[in-house]
Each structure stands twice: as C-alpha cells, then as structure tokens.
C-alpha cells in the first residue's frame, strides 16, 4: 500500500536541483531527498548506504553542480540523479533507498510503500 508522507510545491525544485523534505510524524527523524534531473523527478530516504548517516543536513550542499549529482557531505560519495546509484565514493555500486514520487497539479507528492 502506498501512503503519502509529504508534499511540496513543484516550483520549489528547479531542473538540476535537489531538496530535502521533512517527513512529518516520523519517530526516526528521517528526511527525504527530492531531485529534479533533466529526465525525471526522483525521491529517496536521506541516508547514505555507506554508513547510514544523512547524506546532508543542509540542502545547499546536497547537489554537486559540477558533477550534476547528489553528494554525501561526509565522504563525498556521489549518486546518479535518476537511479540513486553511487558512481563514485566508498559505497560505489550501492543505491539510495527510493521513495515513490509523483507530480500533480503544481505539487510534488512523496510516498512510502507499506505492506
């Protein structure tokens, strides 16, 4: 079952940008990352597969403009914006945990899948 966990205005993320989104009512303090690449909109849990820490706690450091990649501020692992696969860094080949995301009528909706 897919349950909406957050929503933000579509205008809050331009192409080739990433943003952090609070997930309300979550006891683990998790946040989501939303990325708009040139090809698609993607969302992931803000947790590095290398050591489980948040990739970043300040959205202005989340997107590496030179590489067009999401970047972990701790060990500089970089992740492909459409797939979430780490293509350079200590967790090379590992993937961020994806979240279903949809864009409808000026809003980005982020979901969590539950059994």
Regions found by a protein language model. Give the residues of each.
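Functionally engaged cysteine thiol sites
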Residues: 91-92
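N-terminal pre-ligand scaffold of iron-sulfur
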Residues: 1-63, 80-81, 95-115
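Mid-chain, well-packed structural core segment of small domains
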Residues: 56-88
């Amino acid at each position: 079952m897919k349950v909406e966990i957050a929503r933000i205005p579509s205008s809050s993320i331009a192409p080739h940008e990433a943003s952090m989104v609070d997930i309300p009512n979550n006891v683990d303090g998790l946040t989501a990352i939303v990325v708009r690449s040139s090809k698609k909109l993607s969302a992931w849990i803000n947790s590095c597969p290398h050591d489980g820490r948040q990739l970043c706690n300040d959205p202005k450091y989340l997107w590496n403009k030179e590489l067009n990649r999401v970047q972990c501020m701790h060990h500089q692992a970089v992740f492909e914006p459409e797939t979430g696969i780490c293509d350079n860094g200590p967790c090379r080949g590992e993937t961020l945990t994806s979240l279903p995301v949809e864009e409808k009528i000026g809003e980005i909706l982020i979901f969590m899948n539950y059994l």
